[in-house]
Amino acid sequence: MHDKVVSSSSLLPNAQAWQNILAKFVLLFFGIALWMKWMSMSAGFIVALVWILDNGHRRLGQIIKEPLVLAILILCAALALGILWGDYPESGRLKWRRYFALLVFIPFLSLLNKDRLPWAIGGLVSGYAIVLMIGIYQCVIAGEQGIPPLDISYLTFSSMLGIGIIISIYLAGESNHKKIKSALWFLTLLLLYVQFNQHGRGPLVATLLGSGLLIFLRYKSEKKVLLSIAVCFIITAVAFAYSGGLYQRLAQVQTDIELSQQGKYDTSLGYRFAVWDVGLHGIAEKPLFGHGTGVPEGYFEKTVMTYKGGIYKDLPKYMETSHYHNDWIEIGMHLGAFGLLVFAFLLRSWFQTLKAHSLSIPGAALVCFIFISGLTDTFALYTKVVTFLLVITAVAIVWQKKNMGEKTWEYKRVGIF
């Protein structure tokens, strides 16, 4: 009898050890899998499952104290509520469901602690490095935009590069080791060069503005250093602009504008003008609570036939419309002013979370990047990039807790619920 009790009691620590190993592996795996279209969704479900096995749901009351966690829950609840006054589509691409991918932040953050942090960082860096190498090959050797083998568009790849640039600049400023600092600045230049060779104008502008804000905030008290870095950054950007054919793309923008003035909207910029116009018209129709979750996907093609005498009626042949190429118009179409407030609260909470952990400078730069990117595309629907940002945020939070000697969330069998 005594032997059975001893044997049973020894099983619990052993089970917890295996559970910890499983959590480490999943954190490592997720950082790599989030870039793979055929694995990212499954990886998210695996993270959630391991979180439940790790009794993460018992720590939800602690995790929800982070402003970003609360904001994500509010946004997803608002979208779910919006189905009640929307006409749920029987068919369609249902891209709005991608907003719910934000929820993966909760189990990922809850699984992290000081012991598991290196595994999460390893997965994050490994995944980024693998995708970056494939992307550089596609850009420099194959002459392709984006990363076709991984089904990553040039906009997603450009956004990924932009985030890497901002993080590299910040880490270079924080590092006290000359070799590491030099390596990070070299990485920044490499990423910037590749980004200038991508056709994504919006992510590039967001990167330059976000990086500029970061440099200003980081070195504003060191005027000579600030001026030196700013001059070097501008010279580098101009040099890369020439080599990357940016001026040809700017000339294309002017051509698109001229064609739009002639009533020809079947161009990249002209199509966006049309989508924004119809989207703003849709918001004006139902300004308070929008058309309901899911309805805007089919709204464009129905409306263009008669709107403004049908000047956009041929655009469905040019491109199938499933979103409005602007975060604010997109959420406004779904949920109106209510949705706009919720989305603004999300961005504010993202910054507040990073600020609370002494990361206000990179927080301001990243939120600036998200905001600017969302003006020309539905950045919030770029699942891979947004998930990548959330993983960075989670890692940064736990890293800061570790450095400041703060406790992370307790991993006990008995939780608060």
Q: Where in the sequence are the language-model features?
A:
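Hydrophobic transmembrane alpha-helices and their immediate junctions
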Residues: 225, 333-368
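Transmembrane alpha-helices of multi-pass inner-membrane enzymes
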Residues: 48-49, 343, 363-375, 379-417
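Transmembrane signal-anchor hairpin modules in multi-pass inner-membrane enzymes, especially those
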Residues: 1-84, 91, 110-122, 171-182, ...
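A membrane-periplasm/extracellular boundary helix in multi-pass inner-membrane enzymes
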Residues: 197, 218-262, 277-285, 293
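Long extracytoplasmic/lumenal interhelical loops at the membrane interface
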Residues: 264-270, 274-277, 285, 289-335
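Perimembrane helix-loop-helix junctions
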Residues: 52-60, 207-229
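Aromatic-anchored transmembrane helix interface
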Residues: 68-76, 89-112, 128, 151-163
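Alpha-helical transmembrane segments of multi-pass inner-membrane proteins
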Residues: 48, 112-143, 152-219, 241-242, ...
